[in-house]
């Protein structure tokens, strides 16, 4: 019951905040369409950014796989010892 009341309180606060935001929009939000219309030359190189992100993701996945394998080996050794 307490969790439900807390959730209802959060929703009320969320909608209250949204109502205030809609009543007085952020000036930076008005400037966003102008920034989106910037020339393509000012845009970052998304291909190299994507390649860097893919390399980072692959490195993180490899590290996670190695850690998982090490943990599994340690758990198997501990189980074998009894």
Curated annotation (Swiss-Prot):
Q: In which tissues is it expressed?
A: Detected in liver and in blood serum (at protein level).
Q: Does the keyword Coiled coil apply?
A: no
Q: Where in the cell is it found?
A: Secreted
Which residue positions does Arginine amide occur at? 81
From the UniProt annotation, give the residues forming the signal peptide. Answer: 1-23
Superkingdom as given in the UniProt entry: Eukaryota
Q: Which residues cross the membrane?
A: none
What residues make up the propeptide removed on maturation? Answer: 24-44
What changing residue 57 to V does, per the record, is: No significant effect on 3D structure
For this UniProt record, the keywords arranged alphabetically read as follows:
Amidation, Antifreeze protein, Repeat, Secreted, Signal
Q: Record's Gene Ontology CC terms?
A: extracellular space
Q: Does the keyword Hydrolase apply?
A: no
Kindly list the GO molecular function terms attached to this UniProt entry.
Answer: antifreeze activity; ice binding; identical protein binding
- Induction profile: By winter conditions, at least in part by water temperatures of below 8 degrees Celsius.
| Family of this protein | Belongs to the type-I AFP family.
Query: What function does the entry list?
Result: Contributes to protect fish blood from freezing at subzero sea water temperatures. Lowers the blood freezing point. Binds to nascent ice crystals and prevents further growth.
User: What protein name does the entry list?
Assistant: Ice-structuring protein A
Q: What organism is recorded for this protein? A: Pseudopleuronectes americanus (Winter flounder)
């Amino acid at each position: 019951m307490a969790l439900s009341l807390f959730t209802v309180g959060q929703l009320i606060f969320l909608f209250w905040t949204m109502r205030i935001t809609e009543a007085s929009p952020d000036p930076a939000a008005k400037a966003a369409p102008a920034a989106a219309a910037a020339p393509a030359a000012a845009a970052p190189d998304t291909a190299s950014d994507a390649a860097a992100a893919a390399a980072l993701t692959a490195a993180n996945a490899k590290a996670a796989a190695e850690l998982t394998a090490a943990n599994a080996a340690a758990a198997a050794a501990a189980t074998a010892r009894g």
